[in-house]
Amino acid sequence: METHKHGPSLAWWSLLLLLLGLLMPPAIAQDLTYREAVLRAVDAFNQQSSEANLYRLLSMDPQQLEDAKPYTPQPVSFTVKETECPRTTWKLPEQCDFKEDGLVKRCVGTVTRYQAWDSFDIRCNRAQESPEPTGLRKRLRKFRNKIKEKLKKIGQKIQGFVPKLAPRTDY
């Protein structure tokens, strides 16, 4: 009878331990995807930044090393843009709208995809403004402007010539 009495108690404890084991996060850290590693680097940039507003990921370059080990530093490059949210907000950058004329920064560095290490070496600098048009675009723009001026002059000459073609009424 004693064994029968302890039977349900042992089953209950076993079930409880099983449920607790399922609810607990795994002790082994999982590897981050490339995108997750970049997003964590953006978070680290926001935490270390002295800027007034948060920055949000605008774009990221494709992963350069496909088969790299997760604990090996991998090169990353991405672009962030200033949001409307102040740095002191509790919002995630993904919840913030981009600032209309917000600063854009180009970031390069290395990250590890091994979640337990959280290793980032990122440098972000203000992105270059749109470069002045050079080469073919610049020549096409000049050509277009010359054509506009020539057409304007031709239009003025035609307007001056048309009144001379009208029949004279003073006989």
UniProtKB/Swiss-Prot annotation:
Its BP terms in the Gene Ontology are:
antimicrobial humoral immune response mediated by antimicrobial peptide; defense response to Gram-negative bacterium; defense response to Gram-positive bacterium; innate immune response
Gene Ontology terms: cellular component: extracellular space
The record's annotation in InterPro entries points to:
Cathelicidin-like, Cathelicidin_CS, Cathlecidin_C, Cystatin_sf
Whether DNA-binding counts among this entry's keywords is no
Cysteine pairs bridged by disulfides in the record: 85-96, 107-124
Gene Ontology MF annotations: lipopolysaccharide binding
Q: Give the signal peptide, or none.
A: 1-29
The answer to whether UniProt assigns keyword Cell inner membrane to this entry is no
The entry's keywords: Antibiotic, Antimicrobial, Disulfide bond, Secreted, Signal
Locations listed in the record? Secreted
Q: What is its main location?
A: secreted
As annotated in Swiss-Prot or TrEMBL, what is the tissue specificity of this protein?
A: Neutrophils.
Judging by the UniProt lineage, the source's domain of life is Eukaryota
| Family according to the record | Belongs to the cathelicidin family.
Q: What does this protein do?
A: CAP18 binds to the lipid A moiety of bacterial lipopolysaccharides (LPS), a glycolipid present in the outer membrane of all Gram-negative bacteria. Has antibiotic activity.
- In its UniProt entry, what is this protein called? Antimicrobial protein CAP18
Task: Tell me what organism the protein belongs to.
Answer: Oryctolagus cuniculus (Rabbit)
